[in-house]
A protein has these predicted regions:
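A general structural motif
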Residues: 1, 74-76, 100, 212, ...
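GT-A fold catalytic core of metal-dependent nucleotide-sugar glycosyltransferases
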Residues: 56-126, 154-161
Length: 249
């Protein structure tokens, strides 16, 4: 049996106060309902949480529940999806993909993207990888000078989750390192997003030599110039979340 996991936590005062907090509950409900249906179609369990289970300053690191919580050990594959993701194509079964450890979409400048890729190798980002003992790895299927898997859509196998629980570094050590969210006086340490879940997990994947399957944009279509650009999962990142209410509400 496989499982789909989503979560949403109310803001806790750490990080930016985005305007989407004003309407996010509707977005959450829409995404939940779509993925409940997707789970039912593909014979998977659906699990949603709004409880804090991971000891962390930042809500982003609740995603680490994927591997920290032994509750999920009874499931084969775990699909994690952010609450701003919609399965536009219900027929395609992501659980049929052959995954050894984890699978996700590598950030890059896909020609269909609405916004440019913000995840490129920079000195501050390279410093973080080096600080935590991780090599810089380039993607195999797309062009970019660093492989950064977008953590908004991920498949994790049971073996990968158990392995991560045993091996991965403490996420708070990563979050506390040169973090401009926590220390406003820090200069030239990179963007605040360098301190949160996406780079942390990618550092861990590289450090502990996880087998990373690179998915095509059809499984994590971040905002595109053309809403009709074909995909299985659409990911309405950043300030595009209202689109979920407009299109699916």
């Amino acid at each position: 049996m496989n499982v789909i996991f989503q979560y949403w936590l109310d803001k806790n005062g750490v990080g930016k106060n985005h305007d989407f907090y004003n309407y996010v509950n509707k977005v959450v409900d829409i995404s939940k309902n779509y993925f409940k249906e997707y789970a039912n179609i593909h014979n998977a369990e659906y699990f949603f949480s709004n409880e804090r289970t991971v000891k962390t300053k930042s809500n982003y690191f609740e995603v680490c529940r994927i591997y920290l919580d032994p509750y999920f050990d009874k499931f084969d594959k775990l699909l994690f999806v952010d609450i701003d993701v919609i399965p536009k194509n219900m027929k395609e079964n992501i659980f049929n993909l052959d995954v050894k450890d984890i699978a996700g979409w590598p950030e890059h400048n896909h020609p269909a993207r609405k916004d440019p890729n913000g995840w490129k190798l920079s000195f501050p980002l390279e410093d973080r990888f080096k600080k935590f003992g991780a090599p810089i790895i380039k993607p195999k299927t797309v062009k970019n000078n660093i492989r950064i898997i977008n953590t908004g859509v991920m498949i994790w196998t049971r073996d990968a989750r158990i392995k991560a629980r045993k091996l991965f570094d403490n996420h708070e050590d990563y979050f506390n390192y040169k973090n401009p969210i926590l220390d406003k006086n820090l200069k030239n340490v990179g963007h605040s997003t360098h301190c949160i879940d996406q780079p942390f997990l990618n550092v861990m994947f590289n450090k502990y030599d996880f087998d990373v399957k690179e998915l095509g944009i059809e499984w994590n279509r971040t905002p595109t110039k053309d809403e009709d650009y074909p995909c299985n999962f659409a990911h309405y990142t950043g300030n595009n979340k209202k689109k979920i209410i407009e299109l699916y509400g």
